Amino acid sequence: MTSQQIDAEALYQSLVAQLRTRMAGTPAGDWSVAGIVSGGAWIAARLALDLGLREYGIVNVALHRDDYAKKGLHAQAQPTTLPFEVEERRILLVDDVLATGRTIRAAINELFDYGRPAAVELAVLVDRGERQLPIAPDYIGERIALAADESLVLRQEGEGASARFTFTREPKTA
């Protein structure tokens, strides 16, 4: 890894290994995957393929973030799409980077707008450890400390089974 890049593919493979261990012995139909727009949605789509899960959903947190407009994000980016019943389902919630916990809190609120899951487990490629809320991931690619003025940007090349991820460290924008 260079100082500017983090091996997102290696982190993804670590996440897959953890999830395969966790899901061993349970029917794939017991799980539904929901990824947070946009990096989490990319990861969720690939996890669904790699773990043999039937479907995955996309969660848009815009309506539940108190600082969305302040960060320059737009609510209309991509709507929440959950092609499964949330009620009494075991949901694997996926995001690329966990920092303050605010996005995860917003995603859980969005999921509960669709029903009451039996359980929600959280998987992230990177945990920055900058929590402002008591949120903890169940599955982590790696914990990585970044400077306060840095952010990680996930990019996806290709789609489906040929998709590959890369992370780049970039200066944080406002």
From Swiss-Prot:
A biological process from GO: regulation of DNA-templated transcription
UniProt enzyme class: transferase
Keywords: Glycosyltransferase, Transcription, Transcription regulation, Transferase
Function: Regulates the transcription of the pyrimidine nucleotide (pyr) operon in response to exogenous pyrimidines.
UniProt-annotated binding residues for substrate: S38, G39, D95, D96, V97, L98, A99, T100, G101, R102, T103, R128
Catalytic activity: UMP + diphosphate = 5-phospho-alpha-D-ribose 1-diphosphate + uracil
Residues passing through the membrane, by range: none
InterPro entries (alphabetical): PRibTrfase_dom, PRTase-like, PyrR, PyrR_bifunctional
Originating organism: Ralstonia nicotianae (strain ATCC BAA-1114 / GMI1000)
Source organism superkingdom: Bacteria
Phosphoprotein among keywords: no
Protein name per its UniProtKB record: Bifunctional protein PyrR
Enzyme Commission number, as recorded: 2.4.2.9
